[in-house]
Regions:
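Hydrophobic core
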Residues: 13-19
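Long, terminal "pre-/pro-" and other extracytoplasmic accessory regions
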Residues: 2-8, 19-180
């Protein structure tokens, strides 16, 4: 019994140190399974979308692949005026579109509704507190994890700003936490 407790504690400690956790039941949902299957249709990676949105001077604050009306979409939230401008004086927006074509030509939506403004304001604040860009975070995870990075979101875990990175690997989803 004591040996099991020590073994369990060791496993949890190692998972915490390396920041890798399976996502509890997320990969069991029909939506997640459909998204994982659709990822193979993309001609662009998440890092491609992040880099493209950063070219215009805006700073990417989160990015993900998702299904919009059953179709694959690449979505990147940005802070148009950068990380040093507070949310109330910034332009928080989403660039999204199909990644299935040779060029990713996203539509731009400036957030005005409370849920999107609140979520993107939090992401802006967390990215401003950190030292890493989304590009660096994705690249770091790609070096250590097999599979496809399909989501990166700044979040608060244990009173710290971290990036929650979701990786699709062999039909399963892994959650990797990275320091910002």
């Amino acid at each position: 019994m004591k040996r099991r407790s020590v073994l369990s504690l060791t496993v949890v400690l190692l998972m915490t140190m390396f920041g890798v956790m399976p996502v509890a039941s997320a990969d069991d949902s029909k939506d997640t399974k459909a998204l994982l299957e659709a990822l193979g249709k993309s001609k662009h990676t998440l890092i491609d979308g992040v880099r493209q949105t950063a070219k215009g001077g805006a700073v990417p604050i989160s990015a993900k692949f998702e299904l919009e009306d059953g179709k694959l979409s690449l979505s990147v939230y940005t802070a148009e005026k950068g990380l040093s401008v507070p949310a109330e004086k910034n332009v928080l927006q989403e660039l999204s579109g199909s990644p299935e074509g040779d060029k990713w030509a996203p539509n731009v939506e400036v957030f005005k509704d409370v849920p999107h403004v609140a979520r993107s304001s939090e992401q802006l604040t967390l990215m401003a507190l950190g030292k890493a860009s989304l590009t660096n975070i994705i690249a770091r995870v790609q070096k250590t994890q097999s599979g496809t990075v399909f989501s990166v979101t700044p979040v608060i875990r244990n009173h710290r700003a971290v990036a929650e990175v979701l990786v699709a690997d062999d039909g399963k989803v892994k959650k990797v936490l990275q320091p910002l």
